């Protein structure tokens, strides 16, 4: 039997983590998360962090020498060229980590949580694409509350990604997270039991 590799994506603050946590806890599936790999890529002493500090100066670092992620986020979500430069350093590292995880896993089903799955052309790593969506107003509200952002900051982050409509059009499975948690988890169970 071929390995199922689910690419779990969606817009920022749509519920990807909720779905991933459920797949791990209720279905005992291995979860590999791009955000964790991206944090590893810029860990203290990493060549990528050094390159970022050289480009933006020491003010991009916290007193302990680690990356000031909110400050970098503010800079790159306002400037597409800066965002692309940072992503060009981080994404190859993340891709390599996914390839290693896939090669080493013996599980029949893997879940790769990749917020920018479509945007950074990592769809070739997966056998199916699951997109978590919700209404635009819910997404904005959730993001502002979760990340303590202003409306303008939240909108800039949302605008840096493909729209939910564009992601849903490419998806094999669309999970609608605009109503209850129970409704979302039922959709996950159905999608998991349905082989493409």
UniProtKB/Swiss-Prot annotation:
Pathway: Cofactor biosynthesis; coenzyme A biosynthesis; CoA from (R)-pantothenate: step 5/5. It catalyses: 3'-dephospho-CoA + ATP = ADP + CoA + H(+). GO terms for molecular function: ATP binding; dephospho-CoA kinase activity. Keywords: ATP-binding, Coenzyme A biosynthesis, Cytoplasm, Kinase, Nucleotide-binding, Transferase. Its EC number is 2.7.1.24. It comes from the Bacteria. GO terms for biological process: coenzyme A biosynthetic process. Its main location: cytoplasm. Residues 5-196 form the DPCK domain. One of its GO terms (cellular component) is cytoplasm. Pfam families: CoaE (PF01121). SUPFAM superfamilies: P-loop containing nucleoside triphosphate hydrolases. ATP binds at residues 13-18. It is found in: Cytoplasm. Catalyzes the phosphorylation of the 3'-hydroxyl group of dephosphocoenzyme A to form coenzyme A. PANTHER family: BIFUNCTIONAL COENZYME A SYNTHASE-RELATED, DEPHOSPHO-COA KINASE-RELATED. NCBIfam families: dephospho-CoA kinase. Belongs to the CoaE family. This is Dephospho-CoA kinase. It comes from Nostoc sp. (strain PCC 7120 / SAG 25.82 / UTEX 2576). The gene is coaE.
């Amino acid at each position: 039997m071929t390995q199922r590799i689910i690419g779990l994506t969606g817009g920022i603050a749509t519920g990807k983590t909720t779905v991933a946590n459920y797949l791990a806890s209720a279905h005992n599936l291995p979860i590999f998360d791009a955000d964790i790999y991206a944090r590893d890529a810029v860990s203290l002493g990493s060549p990528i962090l050094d390159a970022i500090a050289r480009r933006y100066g020491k003010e991009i670092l916290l007193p302990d020498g680690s990356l000031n992620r909110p400050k970098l986020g503010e800079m790159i979500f306002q400037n597409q060229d800066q965002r692309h430069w940072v992503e060009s350093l981080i994404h190859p590292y993340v891709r390599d980590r996914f390839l290693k995880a896939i090669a080493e896993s013996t599980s029949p089903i893997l879940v790769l949580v990749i917020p920018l799955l479509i945007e950074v052309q990592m769809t070739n790593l997966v056998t199916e694409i699951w997109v978590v969506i919700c209404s635009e107003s819910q997404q904005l509200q959730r993001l502002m509350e979760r990340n303590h952002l202003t409306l303008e900051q939240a909108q800039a982050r949302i605008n840096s990604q493909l729209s939910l409509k564009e992601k849903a059009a490419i998806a094999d499975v669309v999970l609608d997270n605009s109503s209850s948690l129970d409704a979302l988890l039922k959709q996950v169970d159905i999608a998991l039991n349905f082989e493409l």
